[in-house]
Amino acid sequence: MNTRIRKLVYTALFAALTAVGAFLRIPMVYSSVTLQYLFTAMAGLLLGRRWGALSQAVYVLLGLVGLPIFTMGGGFGYVFQPTFGFLLGLIPAAWVVGAVAGESLDPKRMALASLAGLAALYAVGMPYMALILNAYMGKGMTFSALLWAGMLPYLPGDAVKIIVAAGVCPVLRRRLRLADGSDKRGECPCAIQPNRLLKF
């Protein structure tokens, strides 16, 4: 398959998988435990930083224009949901995962990359949640209450997602021919020569 087409197909695939992951959930108070970050981490590990981040940007943009692919629907009004920051955070999270993992097939390196991406996700999501809950909705929640609302209960599930992503992605990269001939900057590894990698 043509390299450009293959990358676009995988980008669309991971945008769709992230959407599906939104509905595989366990409801909580302000958010839900979902499989979204599993697919975000896999996008960064399999597609590289740029294409991985693009897949998540496509997902977020499609939800903002009205497709009901977020946990509680879609549309621009979703920006006023306390959890929207976590959706935005999927984009830099995938970028960080791809940047840290680079071309490595080492599961430990992939786990570290996924952990770094998770930190990026919370770095965007938690301040956004605090802003909406306290400044917009007037909840007046303390720092510890925010941690329990948006992060601490989710960490065990996040750990499982990181382990799964780091376990399956080395095999998938080889089977999908995504591990041959990467450049040195965390781009998508592809089965072509490095000087022919598609840039955008």
Describe the predicted segments one by one:
Residues 1-55, 65:
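Hydrophobic transmembrane alpha-helices
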Residues 3-14, 36-40, 82, 86, ...:
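Residue-level signature of transmembrane alpha-helical entry/exit and packing/kink sites
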Residues 13, 20, 77-123:
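Short helix-perturbing small/polar motifs within transmembrane alpha-helices
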Residues 21-33, 60-93:
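Interfacial aromatic-anchored transmembrane helix boundaries in multi-pass membrane proteins
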Residues 104-183:
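Membrane-embedded alpha-helical hairpins and interfacial helices in multi-pass inner-membrane proteins
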Residues 188, 194, 200:
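Cationic, low-complexity basic patches in intrinsically disordered or flexible, solvent-exposed regions
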